A protein has these predicted regions:
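Thiamine diphosphate
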Residues: 1-155, 157-298
């Protein structure tokens, strides 16, 4: 996802002179072609995330489209006040692109973990927040929002789902499988091998989204009503509760049950690789599907 984002951003940078790149000491080598093309619009500001966001505000007000890129906890938790005042309050066209979510940097410990990023940024008015599941999602989000006059937050991950082959008619809330027994909402890359998951013919409807801040509750209502689907709802997320569950709870009438499968509220004191932490938290594909089977076993 990150590698393909760099390719896409480089192409955008070379074809749109409004694009400015601000890096937090990551991605410099991968974006070398952009730096060489026009060094006046590409900057590595080091570990100065708060300053990067202030610069992004000024650049946006001057007619540029800044892309701020750094590691999730440093660009969201450390820089919350700047996100709120410089970008949210000013409602400027800008992109915050993070890496390391939720615990992609599993070997570096809690300082580099950030499962709460979407909930943190979604709490700021005027921000749009996205949890892409693959590289196609990332490109789709950026291209659709390039002219949107508000700040956008996009979390990148080292792991993609394999949904791209199914996305010929792209939607931000797509029904992938139908069954009346209930409905499972898969957010971003929460389930990596989602194609096999769909092909296993589970006894509940599966819908997919990457859109957190503007989660399409109207479309969800339509899917449920049109299909006569039981309102046993489960949200599966690759992060801590992003707020989608609250949107559903206040928008869908007569819910029978609502469940969350997400990163728990805890310090993760295990080390290793992302897949090790997934298994430890029972958020690997097999564990998630087993949990869903128990929820919809009737």
């Amino acid at each position: 996802m990150r590698k393909n984002f760099y390719k896409y951003l480089t192409s955008l940078f070379k074809n749109d002179n409004r694009t400015v790149i601000l890096l937090g000491d990551i991605g410099v080598f991968s974006l070398k072609s952009a730096f060489d093309h026009d060094p006046s619009r590409a900057y590595n500001l080091g570990i100065m995330e708060q300053s990067m966001i202030g610069a992004a505000c000024g650049l946006s007000k001057s007619g540029f489209i800044p892309f701020v890129h750094s590691i999730a906890p440093f660009i969201t938790e450390r820089s919350y006040e700047q996100l709120k005042l410089n970008l949210g309050y000013e409602k400027v066209n800008s992109f915050i692109i993070s890496v390391g979510n939720s615990y992609d940097y599993a070997g570096l410990g809690c300082t580099h973990h950030c499962p709460n990023d979407l909930r943190i940024v979604s709490s700021i008015p005027n921000f749009k927040t996205y949890c892409p599941g693959n590289s196609l999602d990332v490109q789709e989000i950026i291209s659709k929002n390039l002219e949107t006059q508000c700040p956008k937050y996009i979390r990148l991950s080292e792991v993609e789902n394999n949904l791209t082959s199914l996305q010929s008619n792209y939607e931000d809330l797509a029904e992938l499988h139908y069954n009346q027994n209930g409905i499972c909402i898969v957010v971003g890359n929460a389930i990596k091998d989602i194609v096999s998951f769909i092909n296993s013919n589970p006894n509940y409807t599966i819908v997919y989204t990457y859109n957190v801040s503007d989660f399409n509750t109207e479309k969800l209502n339509s899917i449920i009503d049109k299909g006569g689907i039981s309102k046993n709802i489960t949200v599966v997320e690759p992060c801590s509760d992003s707020g989608i569950i609250s949107k559903i709870a206040t928008s869908i009438k007569n819910i029978e049950s609502i469940n969350s499968i997400s990163v728990p509220k805890m310090f993760i004191e295990k080390y290793g690789k992302k897949e090790n932490i997934d298994k430890y938290l029972e958020l690997d594909d097999n564990s998630i599907i087993e949990k869903l089977s128990k929820i919809y076993e009737h």
